[in-house]
Amino acid sequence: MAKNKGVRIVITLECTECRSASASEKRSPGVSRYTTEKNRRNTTERLEIMKFCPQLNKMTLHKEIK
C-alpha cells in the first residue's frame, strides 16, 4: 500500500508577464508554467518566485496558481 505523502503538495507556477505581454514581445506563443512542490505547513501563502520565462527570454515573476 502507498504511504500518505504528508503536507507536501504539487503546485503550478505561472508567469505573470506572459499574460499581459503582446505577441510582438514574445519569442513564442503561450504562457510559461513550472510545476514544483511546497510544504503547506511552512509556506501557507501562495508562492512568488523569480524564474526564467522562455517565451519572453528573461527572468520574470512566477506566481502559484494551484
From Swiss-Prot:
InterPro entries documented for this protein: Ribosomal_bL33, Ribosomal_bL33_CS, Ribosomal_bL33_sf, Ribosomal_zn-bd
Domain of life: Bacteria
Claim: Transcription regulation is one of the keywords in the record: no
Keywords on record: Ribonucleoprotein, Ribosomal protein
CC per GO annotation: cytoplasm; ribonucleoprotein complex; ribosome
UniProt-recorded Gene Ontology molecular function terms: structural constituent of ribosome
Gene Ontology terms: biological process: translation
HAMAP family (alphabetical): Ribosomal_bL33
Family, as annotated: Belongs to the bacterial ribosomal protein bL33 family.
Listed name of the protein: Large ribosomal subunit protein bL33
Upper taxonomic lineage: Bacteria, Bacillati, Cyanobacteriota, Cyanophyceae, Synechococcales
